Regions:
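Peripheral, non-catalytic regulatory segments
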Residues: 1-112
Length: 112
């Protein structure tokens, strides 16, 4: 179970190429793309993340230095990028708690 506040800001829309501006590979999310990508970046301790083509998520420790290597773009749709276009976000603040319940003697306890 997770409790979190979403704290991020849009940096803008940027071009991308097959030699990705943000290294580390991508993960596809088909629901809650921006939230899912934010959580992935937060869990990995990264400050920047990008979403592309309505389903792809990119994040890496060096993303803040590399996201703009191919220049700014227009045509990112609904904050979720486009074909070879990334909407880039920067995590500003936020707290992420991940915990699990354990059942002990019929009671539930939170394990942090």
């Amino acid at each position: 179970m997770e409790f979190f506040t979403l704290e991020y800001e849009s940096v803008g829309c940027f071009h991308d190429k097959s030699n990705r501006a943000i290294s580390g590979g991508s993960v596809d999310y088909h629901t809650d793309l921006i939230k899912s990508c934010y959580l992935k970046a937060k869990r990995e301790g990264n400050e920047y993340f990008a979403v592309q083509d309505q389903r792809q998520c990119f994040t890496s420790p060096s993303a803040g230095k590399t996201y703009s290597k191919y220049g700014t773009a227009s045509g990112c749709a609904n904050g979720k990028g486009g074909s070879w276009k990334s909407n880039v976000y920067r995590i500003t603040t936020g707290i992420l708690f991940i915990f699990q319940y354990q059942t002990i003697a019929g009671g539930r306890y939170i394990v942090l």
